[in-house]
Amino acid sequence: MEDEAALDRGASFLKHVCDEEEVEGHHTIYIGVHVPKSYRRRRRHKRKAGHREKKEKERVSENYSDKSDVENADESSSSILKPLISPAAERIRFILGEEDDSPAPPQLFTELDELLAVDGQEMEWKETARWIKFEEKVEQGGERWSKPHVATLSLHSLFELRTCMEKGSIMLDREAASLPQLVEMIVDHQIETGLLKPDLKDKVTYTLLRKHRHQTKKSNLRSLADIGKTVSSASRMFTSPENGSPAMTHRNLTSSSLNDISDKPEKDQLKNKFMKKLPRDAEASNVLVGEVDFLDSPFIAFVRLQQAVMLGALTEVPVPTRFLFILLGPKGKAKSYHEIGRAIATLMSDEVFHDIAYKAKDRQDLIAGIDEFLDEVIVLPPGEWDPAIRIEPPKSLPSSDKRKNMYSGGENVQMNGDTPHDGGHGGGGHADCEELQRTGRFCGGLIKDIKRKAPFFASDFYDALNIQALSAILFIYLATVTNAITFGGLLGDATDNMQGVLESFLGTAVSGAVFCLFAGQPLTILSSTGPVLVFERLLFNFSKDHNFDYLEFRLWIGLWSAFLCLILVATDASFLVQYFTRFTEEGFSSLISFIFIYDAFKKMIKLADYYPINSNFKVGYNTQFSCVCVPPNPVNISVSNDTTLAPEDLQTVSSADMYHNATFDWALLTKKECLKYEGKLVGNNCDFVPDITLMSFILFLGTYTSSMALKKFKTSRYFPTTARKLISDFAIILSILIFCVIDALVGVDTPKLIVPSEFKPTSPNRGWFVPPFGGNPWWVYLAAAIPALLVTILIFMDQQITAVIVNRKEHKLKKGAGYHLDLFWVAILMVVCSFMALPWYVAATVISIAHIDSLKMETETSAPGEQPKFLGVREQRVTGTLVFILTGLSVFMAPILKFIPMPVLYGVFLYMGVASLNGVQFMDRLKLLLMPLKHQPDFIYLRHVPLRRVHLFTFLQVLCLALLWILKSTVAAIIFPVMILALVAVRKGMDYLFSQHDLSFLDDVIPEKDKKKKEDEKKKKKKKGSLDSDSDDSDCPYSEKVPSIKIPMDIMEQQPFLSDSKPSDRERSPTFLERHTSC
């Protein structure tokens, strides 16, 4: 009774008998991706059940229902519409819900081989398709593989596959060392169970051991050798006179025409480049289907080996086989066998059925897996979709975790729809972050940070042993050097060279190297910021107006600020970071990105002003454009027509000699020399410099465009995967080198990078150490605490917001953060920089994001058609440390760095600003303002929040950003950090303007004091809640509640093409599925 299929409960509903044409058309119903199965249809008509129908219902009720009797026939017939979990789902929940310590099942490579005639003579197993994630077919020409595509299956083939599993041999956890041993085991099992006649054993064995021909690239000589082997084996093959099939003897088993039964892989397998697409622990699933003329009923077997075994040349790639599905059937149904083979191969590539196949205990577990797959598919009407069209793989695959969690006793998720919302959507609330939990003890957070990071300290060095780290070092180094030069120049102008470019280089090197070596998050890059520059300018002017010693006053402000930062560290004040929601993070990071973009264009416009373009120049009138140098007072100068001084002799001529004694030709002077000796430039072309501005803009935009294009080269169709990845990793360095070479070849004198060549203070009025006393009155030391409070807010906000952005959940950092440890080292370094009169440094948002982007890791092996999965970031201390060491050594590399044009580095700045805006939800919402409704992307928040509320949220964020920009551009920029803090208050005020439902999708819900208590209560309710019904209310108040239709496939009987070896004892009419699936 266990193997006997139940009767079809809906058989009597259909009175129409299908003809052969309709059955053939049934194959054109194709199945694609999953859709919601939660639709309830009401029955409008009631019909009195007949005698036969009542009898069938009573039988089903006895076998599958917990009720003792069935009183209402109509209620019984419509029970599939009740939102009760099906027996198949119950069984899968039991299978996947088992908690064990075994590792996750390995990746499967599935190969479909079909029994085909070679050159119209002998039969061989020929590979026709393969799967890892998506299907690849051998094109009809037989010379190439198709592009990976989503497998579209006929509904009919899935029903037939289910029947195969019901009627065929299921052999689980068997042991075999070779293919002949495995085949013999399968055939003997079929004979023992009465599914195969003993006299057919030799023929079936001979067929299953035929040679396997794989679709691999071979040389012409190898192809000729294969042809010779085929002819040789054909000469040894003979045909049985009874049925025309090859006869089988024990002598034939050792014939060279059979499959290579060696347990070692062949050379072609070892050379197959397709192995790069498979992980190292991958296993194989082989599907063998074909038609023979000596069988009257199908030969079906599904085998799972206890341990994966190498079965010679059975598989295209040298991976051990774990699963084997065999289907041999009578002649005339090759199309059906092919579709059934595709169906089981597609199921084996499905993540849920893949797990079920590894954990199944018996036949019913496998059938339940097929039923679960059927529950999750959609059917496309045959008249509205051409099944010949191959569906391209999606860029992002839907996670199978939803389906797995449903059956593994996890959270209550709604299948084929939206998952219950948990709030953050990747940016995350930080309330549940372990690093931000307040300990209540003195330096408790700092101690926990040290304990958390100490075990990873050694790995932080050897994890950098990858070529990707080299590209990150070069990229971030150039960005850091450019920023140090720019900031140092501005700081020198603001402080009368008390701090200049060299101090900027030295401070960057010392602070950055120490921070990356010992801080909690070494991926953070320290740099100077705009608010610090504004503060330095105001402080210098204040000291100058009140006759204070600027460097000593600044020293005491730095000491007080460092002291206040250490107090914040000791009191675990970093827990306040949890109030920095997506609204604050994206507002801050977007502002800094816009500043980078604005500054890049601002520098180029300034360069265009310095080297103006002569827009009135006409080629035909170039003789009218000139510029000559003339002496300031021709009367006092003796100009000789006979004797002149060459330009190289000018250094020996004093200014007095030029005015009184020298005979001199002023026309030979350069523009710089002419102005130096007080000459005059005369002509209509003196204010213009040819080609420099245009060439600079070409370098600027070319570097940016090239960097963007090469960074995306990883997803290009050109070159092998390794070459594309290498080009993508070194995209910025390659762009810089390309346009440096172009600049050198063209020869236009574009402005170049200028690095100090001497190691000494910029100003001769200062040294490398600032004495703490003697320059100012004693009360200044105490009064310095007031401006130090403002600096502390500035440092805390810049540092912690950048740290929050770096430690976002979507970066998948595994070694943890260290908010307290980071702030501790920033305070210590502030003391060092104050004593050495070096600039103060804090985390730089854009450069830190660029550092993370340059170290992102993706899966090395990905299935054809599958996008590489983001694994995380290469967390280590080497790249940052070497970047800052190289920055300090840049003084000695000035002869090399002077060949880099400044417009190229400005292009890198533009790239960093634009790249850091990628993936920011704020930018996505800005784009929505310009999109018609029908073209808007399917963002999760657009499903649940009205569009006008989304636009209102975006408008408020833009308004705050505009106010911050205006504030930054004025003298009031010194209170910029305080206004960043005000963003938290603005976000808190949004609670009165938006509902918590809307904010949970647009932003993160601000943590409340009792949030942990609520979460604990929610978990208790989940444990007490029943797992037996899909219609229970979700714990999430925002999930949609819709009824689910569960069709228990266990109660359907299907006999599409199989003949039962044990005829039924009673006569009955054909069932619904029999009439639809019989061939």
UniProtKB/Swiss-Prot annotation:
Keyword annotations: Cell membrane, Glycoprotein, Ion transport, Membrane, Phosphoprotein, Sodium, Sodium transport, Symport, Transmembrane, Transmembrane helix, Transport
Region (Interaction with CA4): 748-779
Membrane topology, Cytoplasmic segments: 1-466, 521, 572-585, 711-725, 808-819, 856-877, 919-960, 987-1079
Tissues showing expression: Expressed in vas deferens epithelia (at protein level).
Comp. bias regions, Basic and acidic residues: 53-70, 1062-1079
Entry-annotated residues carrying Phosphotyrosine: 30
Subcellular location, record wording: Basolateral cell membrane; Cell membrane
Keyword ATP-binding on entry: no
GO biological process: bicarbonate transport; regulation of intracellular pH; sodium ion transport; transmembrane transport
Function, as annotated: Electrogenic sodium/bicarbonate cotransporter with a Na(+):HCO3(-) stoichiometry varying from 1:2 to 1:3. May regulate bicarbonate influx/efflux at the basolateral membrane of cells and regulate intracellular pH.
Family: Belongs to the anion exchanger (TC 2.A.31) family.
Protein name, as recorded: Electrogenic sodium bicarbonate cotransporter 1
Taxonomic lineage of the native organism: Eukaryota, Metazoa, Chordata, Craniata, Vertebrata
